[in-house]
Regions:
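Gly/Pro-rich interdomain helix-loop hinge
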Residues: 1-67, 107
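Short, amphipathic C-terminal "tail helix"
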Residues: 64-109
Protein backbone atom coordinates (compact mmCIF):
# COMPACT_ATOMS: atom_id res chain seq x y z
CA UNK A 1 0.00 0.00 0.00
CA UNK A 2 2.88 2.41 0.63
CA UNK A 3 4.06 2.29 -2.97
CA UNK A 4 0.50 2.59 -4.27
CA UNK A 5 0.01 5.73 -2.21
CA UNK A 6 3.30 7.14 -3.52
CA UNK A 7 2.47 6.30 -7.13
CA UNK A 8 -1.12 7.56 -6.82
CA UNK A 9 0.24 11.10 -6.93
CA UNK A 10 0.72 10.43 -10.65
CA UNK A 11 -2.64 11.03 -12.41
CA UNK A 12 -2.31 8.10 -14.83
CA UNK A 13 -1.31 5.68 -12.07
CA UNK A 14 -4.10 6.99 -9.83
CA UNK A 15 -6.70 6.23 -12.48
CA UNK A 16 -5.28 2.74 -12.98
CA UNK A 17 -5.45 2.04 -9.24
CA UNK A 18 -9.01 3.38 -9.12
CA UNK A 19 -9.94 1.11 -12.03
CA UNK A 20 -8.46 -1.90 -10.23
CA UNK A 21 -10.56 -1.01 -7.17
CA UNK A 22 -13.70 -0.72 -9.33
CA UNK A 23 -13.07 -4.09 -10.97
CA UNK A 24 -12.62 -5.65 -7.53
CA UNK A 25 -15.99 -4.22 -6.53
CA UNK A 26 -14.52 -1.99 -3.84
CA UNK A 27 -16.40 1.03 -2.57
CA UNK A 28 -15.56 4.62 -3.32
CA UNK A 29 -17.35 7.56 -4.88
CA UNK A 30 -14.20 9.27 -6.11
CA UNK A 31 -10.73 8.29 -7.24
CA UNK A 32 -9.11 8.95 -3.86
CA UNK A 33 -11.72 6.88 -2.01
CA UNK A 34 -11.27 4.00 -4.45
CA UNK A 35 -7.50 4.07 -3.98
CA UNK A 36 -7.95 4.10 -0.21
CA UNK A 37 -10.31 1.12 -0.49
CA UNK A 38 -7.72 -0.72 -2.57
CA UNK A 39 -5.01 -0.05 0.02
CA UNK A 40 -7.33 -1.14 2.83
CA UNK A 41 -8.11 -4.37 0.97
CA UNK A 42 -4.40 -5.08 0.54
CA UNK A 43 -3.91 -4.43 4.26
CA UNK A 44 -6.70 -6.94 4.99
CA UNK A 45 -5.04 -9.56 2.78
CA UNK A 46 -1.72 -8.94 4.50
CA UNK A 47 -3.30 -9.51 7.92
CA UNK A 48 -4.90 -12.75 6.73
CA UNK A 49 -1.58 -13.91 5.30
CA UNK A 50 0.35 -12.86 8.41
CA UNK A 51 2.43 -10.38 6.43
CA UNK A 52 3.80 -7.68 8.74
CA UNK A 53 2.50 -4.17 8.12
CA UNK A 54 5.85 -2.44 8.53
CA UNK A 55 9.54 -3.17 8.15
CA UNK A 56 9.82 -2.68 11.91
CA UNK A 57 7.27 -5.48 12.37
CA UNK A 58 9.60 -7.75 10.38
CA UNK A 59 12.03 -7.39 13.27
CA UNK A 60 14.47 -4.94 11.70
CA UNK A 61 16.11 -2.96 14.47
CA UNK A 62 15.67 0.80 14.28
CA UNK A 63 19.37 1.58 14.62
CA UNK A 64 20.22 -0.82 11.80
CA UNK A 65 17.47 0.65 9.62
CA UNK A 66 18.69 4.20 10.19
CA UNK A 67 22.28 3.18 9.52
CA UNK A 68 21.48 1.51 6.19
CA UNK A 69 18.41 3.28 4.78
CA UNK A 70 20.34 5.84 2.70
CA UNK A 71 22.40 3.15 0.97
CA UNK A 72 19.35 0.94 0.45
CA UNK A 73 17.49 3.90 -1.08
CA UNK A 74 20.40 4.64 -3.40
CA UNK A 75 20.60 1.02 -4.55
CA UNK A 76 16.83 0.76 -4.98
CA UNK A 77 16.72 3.84 -7.21
CA UNK A 78 19.55 2.39 -9.29
CA UNK A 79 17.77 -0.94 -9.74
CA UNK A 80 16.52 -1.56 -13.28
CA UNK A 81 12.99 -2.34 -12.07
CA UNK A 82 12.61 1.11 -10.51
CA UNK A 83 12.72 2.64 -13.99
CA UNK A 84 9.36 1.04 -14.79
CA UNK A 85 7.67 2.67 -11.80
CA UNK A 86 4.86 4.99 -12.95
CA UNK A 87 6.17 7.85 -10.82
CA UNK A 88 9.82 8.86 -10.86
CA UNK A 89 11.70 8.68 -7.59
CA UNK A 90 15.07 9.95 -6.44
CA UNK A 91 17.18 8.66 -3.54
CA UNK A 92 15.82 11.28 -1.11
CA UNK A 93 12.19 10.35 -1.81
CA UNK A 94 13.04 6.64 -1.78
CA UNK A 95 14.52 7.12 1.67
CA UNK A 96 11.32 8.89 2.76
CA UNK A 97 9.22 6.06 1.31
CA UNK A 98 11.32 3.43 3.06
CA UNK A 99 10.97 5.39 6.29
CA UNK A 100 7.18 5.32 5.88
CA UNK A 101 7.33 1.55 5.37
CA UNK A 102 9.50 1.15 8.45
CA UNK A 103 7.34 3.17 10.84
CA UNK A 104 3.95 2.67 9.16
CA UNK A 105 3.43 6.37 8.55
CA UNK A 106 1.33 8.00 5.85
CA UNK A 107 2.91 8.57 2.44
CA UNK A 108 2.13 12.26 1.95
CA UNK A 109 4.72 13.37 -0.58
Amino acid sequence: PYVIKYNAKDPVAAERYAEIARRLGLEGTCQKALINSLCEKIDEFNVRLNIPKTLKDFGIQEDEFKEKVAKIAELAVGDACTGSNPRAIDPANMEKLLTCTYYGTEVDF
